[in-house]
């Protein structure tokens, strides 16, 4: 076996030339592509993190708005219930006042009707008494006698 130094040197030169060409043509562009890809991924991750933070901020803002809206709804409902209760109480009070007024009017009307009926009854009793007295006395009673007897009878009845 014979070792040829010239082949060895040419092989070595070819190897380094190939290595140099590969470094220029492949290694640097591949390295640059990898570096660009790495930067792109990092930028995408940063954008995603910012988007995540923004989404969380917006979600917190919306949660706050929803909580505020719910609280406002509770307040509106409570106010409406309070107003309805006040209106109910006012309606009941008005109805009670009207009922009491109607009852008082009815009592007054009944009292007036009773008084009127009593007056008419007294008058009728007086007339009947005069007629009875006239029959007993067997004489005609004049209008003046009639009025006098009615007045006397009514005075006695009142006592």
Curated annotation (Swiss-Prot):
Subcellular location per UniProt equals:
Cell membrane
| GO cellular component labels | plasma membrane; proton-transporting ATP synthase complex
State the annotated membrane topology for this chain.
Answer: Single-pass membrane protein
This entry's Gene Ontology molecular function terms read: proton-transporting ATP synthase activity, rotational mechanism; proton-transporting ATPase activity, rotational mechanism
| Keywords associated with the record | ATP synthesis, Cell membrane, CF(0), Hydrogen ion transport, Ion transport, Membrane, Transmembrane, Transmembrane helix, Transport
InterPro entries, per this entry?
ATP_synth_B-like_membr_sf, ATP_synth_b/b'su_bac/chlpt, ATP_synth_F0_bsu_bac, ATP_synthase_B_chain
Keyword Metal-binding listed? The answer is: no
HAMAP family noted in UniProt: ATP_synth_b_bprime
Family affiliation: Belongs to the ATPase B chain family.
User: What does this protein's UniProt record list under function?
Assistant: F(1)F(0) ATP synthase produces ATP from ADP in the presence of a proton or sodium gradient. F-type ATPases consist of two structural domains, F(1) containing the extramembraneous catalytic core and F(0) containing the membrane proton channel, linked together by a central stalk and a peripheral stalk. During catalysis, ATP synthesis in the catalytic domain of F(1) is coupled via a rotary mechanism of the central stalk subunits to proton translocation.
This chain belongs to which protein, by name?
A: ATP synthase subunit b
State the taxonomy lineage: Bacteria, Bacillati, Bacillota, Clostridia, Thermoanaerobacterales
Q: Which gene encodes it?
A: atpF
């Amino acid at each position: 076996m014979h070792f040829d130094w010239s082949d060895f040197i040419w092989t070595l030169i070819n190897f380094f030339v190939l290595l140099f060409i590969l470094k220029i043509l492949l290694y640097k562009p591949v390295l640059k592509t990898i570096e660009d890809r790495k930067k792109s991924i990092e930028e995408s991750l940063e954008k995603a993190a910012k988007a995540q933070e923004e989404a969380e901020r917006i979600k917190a803002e919306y949660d706050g708005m929803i909580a505020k809206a719910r609280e406002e709804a509770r307040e509106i409902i409570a106010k409406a219930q309070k107003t309805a209760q006040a209106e109910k109480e006012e309606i009941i009070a008005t109805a009670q006042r009207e009922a009491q007024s109607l009852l008082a009017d009815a009592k007054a009307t009944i009292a007036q009707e009773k008084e009127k009926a009593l007056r008419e009854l007294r008058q009728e009793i007086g007339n009947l008494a005069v007629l009875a007295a006239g029959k007993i006395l067997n004489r005609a009673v004049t209008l003046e006698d009639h009025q006098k007897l009615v007045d006397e009878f009514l005075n006695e009845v009142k006592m």
